[in-house]
Amino acid sequence: MTPSNEPGKQDQIPQPGPTIPNQYSFLWLSAAIFLMFLWLQGNNQQQQQELAYSEFKQAVISGQVAEVTLRTEEISGSFTDSGASRFANDSRPPSSSFITLRPQVEDPELLPLLERQEVLVRGSRSGRPWWQELILGFLPWILLLALMFWFWGAAQKRMTQGGGPFDYGKSRARRARRETSTTTLDDVAGIESAKRDISEIIDFLKSPDKYRRLGAVMPKGVLLVGPPGTGKTLLARAIAGEAEVPFFSISASEFIEMFVGVGAARVRDMFQTARKEAPALIFIDELDAVGRSRGAGLGGGHDEREQTLNQILTEMDGFEAHENVLVLAATNRPDVLDTALLRPGRFDRKITLDRPHREAREAILKVHVRKVPLAADVDLTQVAARTTGFSGADLKNLVNEAALTAARDNLVEVNNHCFEVAHDRLILGEERDAQLTPEEREAVAYHECGHAIMAYYMPKADPLTKITIIPHGMAMGVTEQTPKEDKYNYTESYLEDRIKVMLGGRSAEKIIYGEVSTGAQNDLKEATKLLRRMVGQWGMSEKIGPLGLGIGEEHVFLGREMGAPREYSEKLAEMIDSEIQSQLLAFEAFTVSFLTEHRQELDALARAVMKRETLSAGEITEVLEEARSRETA
């Protein structure tokens, strides 16, 4: 079956060939007039030898002038065959014609001289023809005034109806065509519930009668919500490849332009275009760029972004039931969106795309390795287990980094080692050369082993994956832990053990050297931040009590107010600070005491790390078990 015979494919209707936009017609006309002006100038300034008046008379006396044309201010004429080359030089190219200026004092001997030499004498009106004088005199002013009126009219048109010579008011929405789209729903994995919702909406657009018979009404809008990299835009691209209806896509930032009113004009134009081709889909990416809550204190009702938002609200609320135009939008900041956007009747349905769980990560990896030759030792289940917290975009980047590693090593297949190297590069950072002194290297080893001992023995801590003292990124060494399974709720005991692991490096330095270094700076920062949230946000302190004060939240600009007000007193703030300090000191004391009791394991593990630089989970267990057996012997 040929594409032209397939039903429902409106996007395959032949399109007319390219035409010159009407707004450029005036520019082409102006260019043509300018070229004609240059041609007229050129015709009046043909190549002629310029002679001094005395040279002209000498040429006449020598019989080298064939004819002349007398004018008020100049004399032009032509040479005989012998005279054309007499006056030629480097600055005067040879020419059969000449021109000379007449002196202001009349020469009574000129005409008798010309008659004696039998030179043909012609008379001529002075200056150019009248029509040339008229054109050359008025043409520059005509062009200038025409350009001024053109730009003035264009600006008025932009302000009133969104048009203009440069299409400022035209929508920047791009129409996706099925035959050019390379992404389908088969390329989207790990978000099956979202795919079902989207498939239902596409089916509604293609077969609305099936739903209308049951009294169902199509949603006006669908909002895709989720962290960056979870597949919102990918899902939209897949819809463009699957839908048998016109699909228009645009980024919300493309509505805003340097001219006032352009954003609202582009919104109107986009919806008008979609209505003409209904049923249709409109996809707006990064909706929060124009959909932030109004009245944020940055600009009033004249704010261009607010005008654009108001126009979107009007267009969506103005839909009729029979229009069959659906708005699909994506954002990773639903908290900043205006409440008018989120009410029923505009974005009726919200689809949440979260970071994938283990099975979903494995499904996503299988999609991304379709074109990647894998070695037999690659186990995608293990790769998925090790990539807790990775988004779909992170997993795609992981596969690509593994393929780059294999190509760098001149391998024909991507093996498990390539995935390990890629994982370390993404999580730990690129390996770098750092010239550490033996003392610094030993200090880094004890620091990382302090983390490792606490992670190994704390019952709620995440299992160890590796220890390395090879510098990665900005870190001199890394102790890596991987959760056994995805976590969605964190218990108080788990968080306490996590803080103890963070303080293990600093405590090990204090035990071995009697002082601490700056290497624990980030550990202290993260431990304090976590404990502040436990005390002030999650109510995990008996002294403060079950109060959710929002302390520790990362207050970003929410679009509604410049900063969150503090909902507790100065006295309570002092109590919270005191509680955080006392708990950190207690955790540090416990960690120092625990590592002191396991000093032999700490020394053995540090020696092994300094010798091998990197230890896997199995090697760590082997070293610690051997040290413990020697201690009990």
UniProtKB/Swiss-Prot annotation:
PROSITE patterns on file: AAA
Residues in the Cytoplasmic compartment per record: 1-19, 155-633
One GO BP annotation of this record: protein catabolic process
Disulfide bonds: none
Sample GO molecular function, one term: ATP binding
Active site: E448
Entry membrane topology: Multi-pass membrane protein
Class of enzymatic activity (EC top level): hydrolase
EC number: 3.4.24.-
Residues that, per the record, bind ATP: G226, P227, P228, G229, T230, G231, K232, T233
Keywords: ATP-binding, Cell inner membrane, Cell membrane, Hydrolase, Membrane, Metal-binding, Metalloprotease, Nucleotide-binding, Protease, Transmembrane, Transmembrane helix, Zinc
Residues annotated for Zn(2+) binding in this entry: H447, H451, D523
Cofactor or coenzyme needed: Zn(2+)
Gene Ontology CC: one annotated term: plasma membrane
Listed transmembrane segments: 20-40, 134-154
Record text on cofactor binding: Binds 1 zinc ion per subunit.
InterPro entries named in the record: AAA+_ATPase, AAA_lid_3, ATPase_AAA_core, ATPase_AAA_CS, FtsH, P-loop_NTPase, Pept_M41_FtsH_extracell, Peptidase_M41
Ranges of the Periplasmic topological domain: 41-133
Subcellular locations according to the entry: Cell inner membrane
Subunit-structure text: Homohexamer.
Function: Acts as a processive, ATP-dependent zinc metallopeptidase for both cytoplasmic and membrane proteins. Plays a role in the quality control of integral membrane proteins.
NCBIfam families reported for this sequence: FtsH_fam
Similarity field: In the central section; belongs to the AAA ATPase family.
Protein name: ATP-dependent zinc metalloprotease FtsH
